[in-house]
C-alpha cells in the first residue's frame, strides 16, 4: 500500500515521513495565553527539527455542561489565529461544528477538523470538503477503525482528497477509553494510505459518571505517545498548558508546558528509529 502525502505548505504529512506535531491547547482561553503556548511550541520544534502545526478550538461546542467554558467564539478566535500566523508563521488546525463556519474558518486556518461526535454528519462533511481545505477527521469513540473508510469516501466524492485521520481512543464500557494500536494500520488500509495521527491527550480522558467534567491520566501521556509512534504513524496531536490544574478544559489530560521539550525529544527519537527500519514482508 502506497502512503499518501498531504501537504500543508512546506510540511509533508504521511505515515512514512517524519512525524508532525499538531500541538497547542485545548481551547483558546485568551490571546496572551495563545501567544505564550504557540511561542513555546515553535521554540521547541524548531530546536529539535520537528514539523509543527498549532492547534486550538475557538468553540468547544460539545461540552457536557451548559455552564462549562466554551471559548471566545469564531470571530474572536479567527483574529487570534491570524495573529499567531502573522507573528510566528505557523500553520493552524481548528475544528468546526456548523456548516456556516466551514468557509470562514478555512479562509484563515490551514486544516479544518471534523469533530469525532459529528464525523457521520453528511451535510457537515460535504460542506467541509467543498472548501478545498485539508480535513482532519477525528475517529468517533463509538466507531471501528475500518468504518473510517466511509467518511473518507464522502469527502473524496466531493472532490477533496486532502484527508488526515486521527484516533482519539475507543469506548471501553462506560466512561473509559482505550487505544487499540492495531487500529492505526486498519485506518491506513481503509483509507488507502491516508496519513493517520494520534490524539494522545484526549485518549487519556476518564469520565466522572456523575460529573460534568472529565478527569484524565496525564501521568501516562508519555507511555501512550511512545506506543503510538512505535506503530509508525504520521503525527501526534497534543495539548499542553502553562498550568494544567487551572485549564478551562481537559486540564487533567494536558501536558505541562514545562515538560514539552523533553517530551518532544523522546518522541522524535522513537519516530526516527521506527522509520529507519525496512518494512518486513510477512505474507506467505
Swiss-Prot record:
Keywords: Cytoplasm, Lipopolysaccharide biosynthesis, Transferase. It catalyses: D-arabinose 5-phosphate + phosphoenolpyruvate + H2O = 3-deoxy-alpha-D-manno-2-octulosonate-8-phosphate + phosphate. One of its GO terms (molecular function) is 3-deoxy-8-phosphooctulonate synthase activity. Signal peptide: none annotated. Its EC number is 2.5.1.55. It is an enzyme of class 2 (transferase). GO terms for cellular component: cytoplasm. One of its GO terms (biological process) is keto-3-deoxy-D-manno-octulosonic acid biosynthetic process. Pathway: Carbohydrate biosynthesis; 3-deoxy-D-manno-octulosonate biosynthesis; 3-deoxy-D-manno-octulosonate from D-ribulose 5-phosphate: step 2/3; Bacterial outer membrane biogenesis; lipopolysaccharide biosynthesis. It is found in: Cytoplasm. It comes from the Bacteria. The keyword Transferase applies. It holds the Pfam family DAHP_synth_1. Belongs to the KdsA family. This is 2-dehydro-3-deoxyphosphooctonate aldolase. It comes from Haemophilus influenzae (strain PittEE).
Amino acid at each position: 500500500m502506497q502512503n499518501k502525502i498531504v501537504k500543508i505548505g512546506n510540511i509533508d504529512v504521511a505515515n512514512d515521513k517524519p512525524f508532525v506535531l499538531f500541538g497547542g491547547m485545548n481551547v483558546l482561553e485568551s490571546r496572551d495565553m495563545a501567544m505564550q503556548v504557540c511561542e513555546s511550541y515553535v521554540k521547541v520544534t524548531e530546536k529539535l527539527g520537528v514539523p509543527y502545526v498549532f492547534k486550538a478550538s475557538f468553540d468547544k461546542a460539545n461540552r457536557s455542561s451548559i455552564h462549562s467554558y466554551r471559548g471566545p467564539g469564531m470571530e474572536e478566535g479567527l483574529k487570534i489565529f491570524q495573529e499567531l500566523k502573522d507573528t510566528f508563521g505557523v500553520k493552524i488546525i481548528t475544528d468546526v461544528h456548523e456548516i456556516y463556519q466551514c468557509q470562514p474558518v478555512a479562509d484563515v486556518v490551514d486544516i479544518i477538523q471534523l469533530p469525532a461526535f459529528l464525523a457521520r454528519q453528511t451535510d457537515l462533511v460535504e460542506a467541509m470538503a467543498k472548501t478545498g481545505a485539508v480535513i482532519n477527521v477525528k475517529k468517533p469513540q463509538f466507531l471501528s477503525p475500518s468504518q473510517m473508510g466511509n467518511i473518507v469516501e464522502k469527502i473524496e466524492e466531493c472532490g477533496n482528497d486532502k484527508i488526515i485521520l486521527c484516533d482519539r481512543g475507543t469506548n471501553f464500557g462506560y466512561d473509559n477509553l482505550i487505544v487499540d494500536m492495531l487500529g492505526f494500520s486498519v485506518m491506513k488500509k481503509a483509507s488507502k494510505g491516508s496519513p493517520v495521527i494520534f490524539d494522545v491527550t484526549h485518549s487519556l480522558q476518564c469520565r466522572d459518571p456523575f460529573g460534568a467534567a472529565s478527569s484524565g491520566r496525564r501521568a501516562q501521556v508519555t507511555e501512550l505517545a511512545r506506543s503510538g509512534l512505535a506503530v509508525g504513524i504520521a503525527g501526534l496531536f497534543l495539548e499542553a498548558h502553562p498550568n494544567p490544574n487551572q485549564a478551562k478544559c481537559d486540564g487533567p489530560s494536558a501536558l505541562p508546558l514545562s515538560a514539552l521539550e523533553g517530551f518532544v525529544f523522546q518522541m522524535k527519537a522513537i519516530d526516527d528509529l521506527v522509520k529507519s527500519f525496512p518494512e518486513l514482508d510477512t505474507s506467505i
